[in-house]
């Protein structure tokens, strides 16, 4: 019966989209070629949905051998479907670059959901664990984000349960320039922390709290590829990906170190712009401070030539050192070492002048001490002719009174005086000398 109905109609052309229909589907009296174009499109949609929900039956089993039916080898049968995604959007090997990242013009052209970048390491059931992003996922980096900011909280406070991920976490923006990569990483780290992955992210002071799982590594790779397009990655990031295109954690660690370095660079340049020196501190300390700043900037890829460095230094000089701003204006090739040589010379002259002033300046108390010392050292000592000590039982006044009495009332031949030739005579004079009577 079925063969008679097929023989009554004209043969099916090789280009028909319904060439793979089964014998049960052609039991209608209407010629399948007379179906309108709208019904044909509807048939194709139904057919596509049917193939996506149930395994496709091989053409050899679907179409029985019939001499009046079109040959299945010559008919253009639709390509078999590979999962729920159309074949024409699958990533081909030609779409991958040397670093392993597929080349997409825009994330909306992503052939897989955000967490199925490649079938080779898409874990089973990964789609049910992570958030599926809506169509506004393609925002740019300059779009304001509530999670964006220059600082992010400590990753130790984040949870690690991926099944409880916030369903309303805003995704990071799309990277549009290599110069904005570090700013993009700040927002991306904030996004990971809001997705309960903060404890797998290392910081500048410590390593990650725990090691990530395979599902979390897949999540990291997928989101990084989705929002950081390969053509906008810096060179050093591409170098890391060329070795291992899944080593996203190394990229994040190096980015954090670069952020810290950039902060130090800003501080160093600010310090150079606000230098101040007036000789209150040693010249060696000032030179060491400036030299360390210049060396740090040079090591971080920001070399400062001698002309600019000398301008920074001279602008900070004040007081007597302000003269150095104009002392070497004729020298075009002046170096930082030459300028510091002048600063050292002026500092030594300043210190020598201070020492000389302190030497010539004398206080009144020091002058009194010097005068007293001079008087004591020039006072003559008393001289005695006899080794016998004088009698000190009487006072000096009494002895002088006795001598004067004996002079006023002398005895015959001055017996009193002659009788005491061995005793010294006390004379009241300004030198307080003790003389013998014979020498008076």
Curated annotation (Swiss-Prot):
InterPro entries: TYA
Stretches with biased composition (Polar residues): 1-31, 137-168, 373-409
Record's signal peptide: none
Keyword Acetylation: no
Presence of the UniProt keyword RNA-binding in the record: yes
GO CC terms: cytoplasm
S-S pairs: none
Comp. bias regions, Basic and acidic residues: 363-372, 429-440
Pfam families documented for this protein: TYA (PF01021)
Positions of region (Disordered): 1-75, 137-174, 350-440
Subcellular location: Cytoplasm
Listed GO MF terms: RNA binding
Domain notes: The C-terminal RNA-binding region of CA is sufficient for all its nucleocapsid-like chaperone activities.
Chain's role: Capsid protein (CA) is the structural component of the virus-like particle (VLP), forming the shell that encapsulates the retrotransposons dimeric RNA genome. The particles are assembled from trimer-clustered units and there are holes in the capsid shells that allow for the diffusion of macromolecules. CA also has nucleocapsid-like chaperone activity, promoting primer tRNA(i)-Met annealing to the multipartite primer-binding site (PBS), dimerization of Ty1 RNA and initiation of reverse transcription.
Protein name as annotated: Transposon Ty1-DR2 Gag polyprotein
Species whose genome carries this gene: Saccharomyces cerevisiae (strain ATCC 204508 / S288c) (Baker's yeast)
Gene: TY1A-DR2
